[in-house]
UniProtKB/Swiss-Prot annotation:
Family: Belongs to the leguminous lectin family.
Changes after translation: Glycosylated.
Membrane recorded as keyword: no
Reported function: D-galactose-specific lectin. Has Ca(2+) and Mn(2+)-independent hemagglutinating activity towards rabbit erythrocytes. Has an epithelium-dependent vasorelaxant effect in vitro.
Activity vs pH: Hemagglutinating activity stable between pH 6 and 8.
Temperature dependence: Hemagglutinating activity stable up to 60 degrees Celsius but diminishes with higher temperatures and is absent at 100 degrees Celsius.
InterPro entries per UniProt: ConA-like_dom_sf, L-lectin, Lectin_LegA_CS, Lectin_legB_Mn/Ca_BS, Legume_lectin_dom, Leguminous_Lectin
Residues carrying a glycan: 111, 183
Name of the featured protein: Seed lectin
Xref: SUPFAM superfamilies: Concanavalin A-like lectins/glucanases (SSF49899)
Assembly: Tetramer.
GO MF entry, a single one: carbohydrate binding
CDD domains linked: lectin_legume_LecRK_Arcelin_ConA (cd06899)
Length: 239
């Protein structure tokens, strides 16, 4: 089957191939700024998401085939007070008509009334909510805001983080790694995820981020570049 791939070394301020939701925008310098910044300072209660416009065929009912994919991106999270950060950024896969959910600790992906939203995410979580581990962490979330697997994350204020996420359909393994080139630290987490049971056949992929719900727990969430390749489940068009 044909490979679906795209690559952004930076983003277009008037993007045709990115769907912006909530507060997300692209700056004049080509940064994908997911949450609101005013006068150079991050704003609380902000939620922004960005989706690649073309849906991806993640599994195929007629053949039972499941797609493999790999995605890489760089992001920066910067906080005015590095002891008080919230709430985080995530890469996610969701139904093509996906809309922003609850802000704050739900990261724009989930909410407390509907626990079973079809969304698979890798979260880079900077605030410990009641359902979270007690430290900043990188988690793999399958249809729940509670991470199925996680690793503690030594977040670096204002430093570029390089992320690589891959899904191997044959072993149903979702793996995420984050590296800070500035100090050569890296973190890795992987989980067994059955995309066929977690998601519909077609999905959109993208990013979601939320700032904290109090004025002193805020941070920026900027994606600098993004590329992805996937070997789809079948040769067919989204209808």
């Amino acid at each position: 089957s044909e490979v679906v791939s795209f690559s952004f070394t930076k983003f277009n301020p008037n993007p045709k191939d990115i769907i912006l939701q909530g507060d997300a925008l692209v700056t004049s310098k080509g940064k994908l700024q997911l949450t609101k910044v005013e006068d150079g300072e991050p704003v609380d209660h902000s939620l922004g998401r960005a989706l690649y416009v073309a849906p991806i065929h993640i599994w195929d009912d007629s053949t039972d085939r499941v797609a493999s994919f790999a995605t890489s991106f760089s992001f920066v999270v910067e906080a005015p007070d590095e002891s008080k950060t919230a709430d985080g950024i995530a890469f996610f896969l969701a139904p093509p008509d996906t809309q922003p959910q609850k802000n704050g600790g739900f990261l724009g992906l989930f909410n407390d009334s509907n626990k079973s939203i079809q969304t698979v995410a890798v979260e880079f979580d900077t605030f410990s909510n009641t359902w979270d581990p007690s430290a900043r962490h990188i988690g793999i979330n399958v249809n729940s805001i509670e991470s199925q697997k996680y690793v503690k994350w030594g977040w670096e204020d204002g430093k570029v983080a390089n992320v690589y996420i891959s899904y191997q359909a044959s072993t149903k393994t979702l793996t995420a790694s984050l590296t800070y080139p500035s100090n050569a630290t890296s973190y890795i987490v992987s989980a067994n995820v059955d995309l066929k049971s977690a998601l519909p056949e077609w999905v959109r992929v993208g990013f979601s981020a939320t700032s904290g719900l109090s004025r002193d727990h805020v941070e920026t969430h900027d994606v600098l570049d993004w590329s992805q390749t996937s070997t789809p489940a079948a040769n067919s068009d989204y209808t």
